[in-house]
Amino acid sequence: MTLAVRRWAIVPAAGQGSRFGAGLPKQYVAVLGRPLLSWTLSSLLAGPRVDGIVVALAPGDRHWRDLPEAHDPRVRHCAGGARRELSVANGLEALAGNASDTDWVLVH
């Protein structure tokens, strides 16, 4: 029996954007009327090539639940880390129970 290869995406989004100076994390800054993170997630979800997404978020993120994509069953979230590589590691750990050894993982 051959298992279908699934494709997952990890989106590190735990940054605070303090250098960006917008008053909120840059992933939530509106671009053409939508938060940047919403554009990213909707683009990944629109294609047939991504089976699921894990978004690594800062503890206490107050903006996540406002995104429509946060309620899509293909999208889950995990705690982000203090640095990008820690957020990616947490995303991989969050996939551990669902992804198989032959699956692919895209890191945005």
Task: Give the predicted meaning of each segment.
Residues 2, 38-102:
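Conserved N-terminal catalytic core of the sugar/cofactor nucleotidyltransferase
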Residues 6-59:
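N-terminal glycine-rich phosphate-binding loop and ensuing alpha1 helix
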Residues 104-108:
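Short aromatic-hydrophobic micro-motifs that form the base-stacking/packing surface
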